[in-house]
Amino acid sequence: MKISLIALLMFLTAGILSAQEYKIPTTNSKDGKLILKDFSGSLPIEGYNGTDIIIASTSEDLTPPAKAKGLKPVFPAGTDNTGIGLDVEKTDNTITVTCLLPFTRDGEYKLRVPENLSVEITSGCERNTDISIQNLKNEIDIKTCHDIKLANVTGPLVLSTISGNIDVTYSSINTAKSSSVNSISGEIDITLPVKTATDLELRTVSGAVYSDFDFSDTRKNMKKIGGNDMNYSLNGGGFKFNIGTVSGNIYLRKGN
């Protein structure tokens, strides 16, 4: 009897988890773009070698109360066409996913994304969204007020946060476009491939810059702008990379 009950519970749990997963067919193409808006809580995103955007939600059941039978939920930002509190719109090669839940409620979403898509994320300060991304091979553009953590990415990157820390580890670097990483009151920690050829713009007002790259032999190429602002050509120079914070430190590390 005990074994039967356990099996029944496992079956029911599997059904619930399946019902909370939503797939968006797409292509694993660098021409494709995913836009995410208004997500709250932690937002982990993982790139993979597949063609579907897979969104899993572990948030509480969104089924309307019995009193709402025959009625549909109404949201100011769109229509829940997924069953997990999201509005999905497709235009050409761009897919836009908007979280419809109020900012007081964490969505508890996890995403798996085709690794070659570019990703754009916007999240207001009221949404307390900590974003973590790994294993993507295209452009990432994030505007938030909270923490950003990227691992095994190539860029280009355009990252902006107000009060969060930014942590980036590159696998390799796409130099087709310039990159920009900025925080107002957070620290920035970036690990670059050791042979990266880039023109760096480093800026901090009340913080400091720390690095294990050897600046001494080419110090003559470093231009001091004022305060702790510097322009520096690394490995002969290349694509433009702006890294700036107002009140935090900058850590620039050697990777593989």
Question: What do the PLM-derived regions correspond to, one by one?
Answer:
Residues 41-43, 170, 248:
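Extended lipid/amphipathic-ligand handling interfaces
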Residues 121-122, 128-131, 167-168, 189-191, ...:
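Beta-strand-rich extracellular passenger or scaffold domains
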